[in-house]
């Protein structure tokens, strides 16, 4: 094998991919600027995550965020990184972060046309034990001519123009969903670029894995209890489903996307409105899943149809392979009819 054969000289970077998509759509290039800036933050967070122990970034920063979670030092660093790079992209006007109580309004001289909702470091309760964590983001167009405000972020997920997540695992991967589908990019540390590795990703119609925190079993809705029982003891004597639950949404959803199956964080007696946040956790993941051919629901309605009233609103979420999610929805309907 020659050196040339071992080295791809026509690689598709994320920048090239987005520029090509933008050219097809005759865009202004602002989305490319925005995603390039986001990639810079993801690379920096990836580096910080990998050297967190040496740099003393583990542990608690000594406060809680707006939704009551303890803030870790890496959370603070990641949040500052994402905010600063998005502001300096000159493509955003409103930012919503899990870590900030109020929406961040970008300075007039730096404003663009996009609204970005993000969780800078999802799964951060797992940082200290080295479990995979990630960054989640959803991008909307500002849909009014008024001065930018928090209201610009209160759009249903159907209005998303792009969404995705970065996974800091055995490698750093960025999964990007846009109008034409879902594509996966791997960070090549040798050249510092995200390289397209999976084009137009589609989830399996039916999987063989279910993912839920069964520690809440006594609080579950009867429909969830029945569904899990069916997966463990199939009435048709087929092979039971495997159970996998990491406790880091990015890791659990990415596994579901790759292998198929179902991920559930439903409402329960303790959290009747669900626990995960709609704008920067549920909506982006639901958008990715639907663009990959899957389904995402609360059990009563499509996640992407919810019109938010608060930037930190919570929602139940069930997503995954269409046949698996449909089976659970049928059980919900059966119980609702009783």
From Swiss-Prot:
One of its GO terms (molecular function) is RNA polymerase II-specific DNA-binding transcription factor binding. The modification Phosphoserine is found at residue 208. The modification N-acetylthreonine is found at residue 2. Its EC number is 3.1.3.11. Mg(2+) 1 binds at residues 69, 98. Substrate binds at residues 122-125, 213-216, 244-249, 265, 275-277. The keyword Repeat does not apply. Catalyzes the hydrolysis of fructose 1,6-bisphosphate to fructose 6-phosphate in the presence of divalent cations, acting as a rate-limiting enzyme in gluconeogenesis. Plays a role in regulating glucose sensing and insulin secretion of pancreatic beta-cells. Appears to modulate glycerol gluconeogenesis in liver. Important regulator of appetite and adiposity; increased expression of the protein in liver after nutrient excess increases circulating satiety hormones and reduces appetite-stimulating neuropeptides and thus seems to provide a feedback mechanism to limit weight gain. This is Fructose-1,6-bisphosphatase 1. The gene is FBP1.
């Amino acid at each position: 094998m020659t050196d040339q054969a071992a080295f791809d000289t026509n690689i598709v970077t994320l920048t090239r991919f987005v520029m090509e998509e933008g050219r097809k759509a005759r865009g202004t290039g602002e989305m490319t600027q925005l995603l390039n800036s986001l990639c810079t933050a993801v690379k920096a967070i990836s580096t910080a995550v990998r050297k967190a122990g040496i740099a003393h970034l583990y542990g608690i920063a000594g406060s809680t965020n707006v939704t009551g979670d303890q803030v870790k030092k890496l959370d603070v660093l990641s949040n500052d990184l994402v905010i600063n790079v998005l502001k300096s992209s000159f493509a955003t006007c409103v930012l919503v972060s899990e870590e900030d109580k109020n929406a961040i309004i970008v300075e007039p001289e730096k404003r663009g046309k996009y609204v970005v909702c993000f969780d800078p470091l999802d799964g951060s309760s797992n940082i200290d034990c080295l479990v995979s964590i990630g960054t989640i983001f959803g991008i909307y167009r500002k849909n009014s001519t008024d001065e930018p405000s928090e209201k610009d972020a209160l759009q249903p997920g159907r209005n998303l123009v792009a969404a995705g997540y970065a996974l800091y695992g055995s490698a750093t991967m960025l999964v990007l969903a846009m109008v034409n589908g879902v594509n996966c990019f791997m960070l090549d540390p040798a050249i510092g670029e995200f390289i397209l590795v999976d084009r137009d990703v589609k989830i399996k119609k039916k999987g063989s894995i279910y993912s839920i925190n069964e520690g809440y079993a006594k609080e579950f809705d009867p429909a969830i209890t029945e569904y899990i029982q069916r997966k463990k003891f199939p009435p048709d004597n087929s092979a039971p489903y495997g159970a996998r639950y990491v406790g880091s949404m990015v890791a659990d959803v990415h596994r579901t996307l790759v292998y198929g199956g179902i991920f559930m964080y439903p409402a329960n007696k303790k959290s009747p409105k669900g626990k995960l946040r709609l704008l920067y956790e549920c909506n982006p993941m639901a958008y990715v899943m639907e663009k990959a051919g899957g389904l995402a629901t609360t059990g009563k309605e499509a996640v992407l149809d919810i019109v938010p009233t608060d930037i930190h609103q919570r929602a139940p979420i069930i997503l995954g392979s269409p046949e698996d999610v449909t089976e659970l929805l049928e059980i919900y309907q059966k119980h609702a009819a009783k």
